[in-house]
Each structure stands twice: as structure tokens, then as C-alpha cells.
Amino acid sequence: MSERRVAMDLPSGSNASMPLQRHRVSSLRGTRSPSSLDSPPASRTSAVGSLVRAPGVYVGVAPSGGIGGLGARVTRRALGISSVFLQGLRSSGLATAPAPGPERNHATAEDLGGCLVEYMTKVHALEQVSQELETQLRAHLESKAKRSGGWDALRASWASSYQQVGEAVLENARLMLQMETIQAGADDFKERYENEQPFRKAAEEEVSSLYKVIDEANLTKTDLEHQIESLKEELGSLSRSYEEDVKVLYKQLAGSELEQTDVPMGTGLDDVLETIRVQWERDVEKNRAEAGAVLQAKQQTEVVHVSQTQEEKLAAALSVELHDTSRQVQSLQAETESLRALKRGLENTLHDAKHWHDMELQNLGAVVGRLEAELAEIHSETEQQQQERAHLLACKGQLQKDVASYHALLDREESN
């Protein structure tokens, strides 16, 4: 009996490949309808005996309700019958006295029907006991809750505590967000400060170089002022010497007189004319010498005046050049400051652009990482589904092989 399989032919509308064990619980939970399994042994024997077929061992159509409606070829494992139960069945008088041929199969079917009826009776009794215990337990819990005065006060305190905890969690999250924002701002300012340090050093170096240029310009200015003072002193000394020379010349011209001749004049006309000619030539030579001296003094005066004019022009040109140089230095300083401001603005713009670019790259990287994680998860799910499908196909093939082997075994038994 342990080596034999018992098959049942149920209505064609039911699934022929579904095991009975899978739907046993659902069928037992429903309301049982009257069936031949709940009927007396005599009627059950007649119902089973009317549906027996030869030469195989088959159990006919079961009534609706109970285990009816589940058409399947079942084994003792599918029926949930333990080996102990079957051992007890084998130890009974019905199993020890098998009848040959159809009578043996009929007796085996009757024994199996009786075992199933007893099993169903025990199951329904256990279900009723379980329902009664559940009802008693529920009533006990309700009475205990009523005696304790209800859960409204505790529920209200629990709700208030839950609300306070939720508010505290939200406040903590808000504070954490503020701290993260402040920390991010501090890190940003620190990074900007560190980035501005090289530019600050470069600006300080430029300012120090400009201070050196200004010091050199001040030294040049002082030197030029000293040169102008020395030129003014030299010009004053030249003008004083010129005035003294002019005064000496004026005195010389004012104190000069005609020289008297000591030569006696003759009495004749020729002697008188000769004397006048000699005196005239002498006066002409004297006047020529005086005119030459005057012209030479005038030329010297003009040279001194010209040199004085050139020195004044040189001093004026130097002062104008100094003024232009200072003005150019001031304009260069203003232009340098404007260029520094422009440079700082461009550097800040570049830094902001780099910062936003890095933020965009980080956001895109996070999105790409999330998409890659989702893609990997989808791949893993797909592989898992493929493995499950392969496993199900393998199980299907194995079940088909088992069914074929069962059919072959039953056919061999029928042929025997």
C-alpha cells in the first residue's frame, strides 16, 4: 500500500494537474454541503460502489462541498495522509484480507473513503474548537479592556507624545538643515578667502612697487628742485656781475676826455691842414676804439642775457615736465586701481561660474549615479526573474516527467 498510488477521476471542468494538498485548506474553510462523505456507511458504500470502474482503481465524482470539485490524480502525500495513518489502515482487517481483482480495488476505495471521512470529521472538529477558543479569547480581552477603564486616556497621551516626538524630529531636521547651510556658507567664504589670498599678495606687491616708483619720483623731484635753486643762485650771481660790469663801463665812458696835443701848430696853411688831419685821424682811431669797446661790452651783455634766458627756459621746462610726470603718475595710479577693481570683479565672476558649474556637475553626477543604481537594480531583477523562470520551467519539465511516469505506472497497473 505504501508503494501504490491512488488516482481519482473527478469532473472534466476541474484542473487535472492540480494537487489536492494546495486547495485543501481553502476547501476546509468554506461551508460544507451535504455529501456522501458525511452520510452513513451504507449510503457511502453504495455511492462509492456505483462509481467503481474496472480494472483500475479509481474513485468517482465526489459531491460538491468538502473536497468536491478538485479533480486530480492524487497521492497519499497530496491527500495529507501520513504514513502512520496508512500503517494503521494496513493493520486493519480490511487491509490484511485483500480480495483478488475488482473486489480488492473496491475494498481499498471504501477504506480510503472511510479514512477521508474520519480525517474530515477531525478537521472540522478542530476548526470548531479553534473558533470557540478565538471567540472566548476575544471576549476575555474585551472584558479585560472594559475593566481597565478604556484606552482613551492612554491613546490621547500616546497621540500627544507622538505629536511631540514628530515636532521634535521636524525641529531637529530644520536645525540640522540650518547648520548644514551655515557650514556650507562658511566653507564657501573660507574657500573664497583662500582663493583671494594670492591676489591680495599680488596687489600688495604691486602697491609696494608703486610706492617705490613714487619714492624715486620724489627723489627726482627733490634733485630737480636743488638744481633749480642752484641755477637761480648762479643766475643771480651772473646778473649781479653783469650789472657791475655795466656800471664800470658807464663810468669809463663818462670819465673819458679828448687828449690835448702838445705838437705846435705851424703858421702855414699846409702845416695847419696837416695838424688838423693828424688830430682828426687820432680822434677817429679813439672813437673807433671806444665804439669797439662799447660793442664788445654790449655783446657780452647780450650773451649773459641769452644764457640767463636759456636757464630760465630750462627751469620752466623742468617744472612743466615735473608737473606732467606727477600728473601721469596720478593717472597711472587711477588706471591701476580701476584695472584692479575690474580684475577683482572678473575673478569673482569666474569663481562664481566655477562654483555653479561644480554644483551642476555634482547634481548631474548624483542623477547619473541614481539612474545607474536603478539600472543595476533593474538588471538584477531581470536576472532574478530569468532565474525564476528557468527554475519554473525546470520544475514544469520535472512535473511533466513525473506525471508521465505516473501515467505509465497506472497504465502498467491497469494492464496487469
Swiss-Prot record:
Compositional bias segments (type: Polar residues): 28-48
Membrane topology: Peripheral membrane protein
Coiled-coil annotated residue ranges, if any: 199-240, 314-391
Domain named IF rod: residues: 105-416
Spans annotated as Disordered: 1-48
Keywords on record: Acetylation, Cell membrane, Coiled coil, Cytoplasm, Cytoskeleton, Eye lens protein, Intermediate filament, Membrane, Phosphoprotein, Sensory transduction, Vision
GO molecular function annotations of the record: structural constituent of eye lens
Gene3D superfamilies named among the record's database cross-references: 1.20.5.170, Single helix bin, Vasodilator-stimulated phosphoprotein
Spans annotated as Tail: 397-416
Principal location class: membrane
Residue numbers spanned by region Head: 2-115
Pfam families the record matches: Filament
Residue(s) carrying N-acetylserine: S2
Entry-linked PROSITE patterns: IF_ROD_2 (PS51842)
Modified residues (Phosphoserine): S27, S33, S36, S91
GO terms for cellular component: cell cortex; cytoplasm; cytoskeleton; intermediate filament; plasma membrane
InterPro entries membership: IF_rod_dom (IPR039008), Keratin_I (IPR002957)
Tissue-wise expression: Expressed in the deep and shallow cortices of the retina lens (at protein level).
Subcellular location: Cell membrane; Cytoplasm; Cytoplasm, Cytoskeleton; Cytoplasm, Cell cortex
Alphabetical GO biological process terms: cell maturation; cytoskeleton organization; intermediate filament cytoskeleton organization; intermediate filament organization; lens fiber cell development; visual perception
Subunit structure: Part of a complex required for lens intermediate filament formation composed of BFSP1, BFSP2, and CRYAA. Found in a complex composed of PPL (via C-terminal linker domain), BFSP1 and BFSP2 in the retinal lens. Within the complex interacts with PPL (via C-terminal linker domain) and with BFSP1. Identified in a complex that contains VIM, EZR, AHNAK, BFSP1, BFSP2, ANK2, PLEC, PRX and spectrin. Interacts with LGSN. Interacts with VIM.
Family assignment from sequence similarity: Belongs to the intermediate filament family.
Purpose: Required for the correct formation of lens intermediate filaments as part of a complex composed of BFSP1, BFSP2 and CRYAA. Plays a role in maintenance of retinal lens optical clarity.
Protein name, UniProt field: Phakinin
Species the sequence originates in: Rattus norvegicus
